[in-house]
């Protein structure tokens, strides 16, 4: 927690809600190091490792110590329930005692999950001016107009009248130093623009892709999938996206784009189970 000696906004920066999304964690840690010794107005709180049980297991989920409990997606149970299961109680304790009381604004740092990649990608509820403002200051490749879903930390913040965004910092599990630096610079832009720290906002690149609809192309069957597109490619309806092979290397499936859209995610691990993500599109 960085408490300023001058009045200002209180911003909460979280990471590690999903334990295998390490670029978000590394971004939060880097940001904290770079804030050391700076003049601060208001208060900046950084929680870099929300889901320690998942981080220890390289797992997306929250894992209970109780032998009769199943793992849970922590980012689907906020604000939690003090009388619920252990994941719900944990989320509620965090929300009521740390996350909500210390925030006028919030940024939740993630990455794509293991096996797939994202660009620098922001979720923002366009009904909230501060959410749009923060998302564009991040200088991402993509912004999704995201009204939110129940249980997601960003949504719970927004519904509590605390403007929030989610930032996806590239690939799942594996370290991407360039993406971490971009995300750190983006969060610093937010801090500067809201006058929590001194300095000028880094000039923004040309406008990013902003969309309202996500289309996910998923594996029809198990096998090995090779993608033929890259992140941020603009694809046409009917364009080939990926080819799938069986255990013997025989071609068994071809995947095509159902719409004209921009590629924002694709698998980076070839083994795909039925229903696993192959390519994700935004338009």
Predicted regions and their residues:
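Structured catalytic-domain cores with a bias toward divalent-metal coordination
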Residues: 1-283
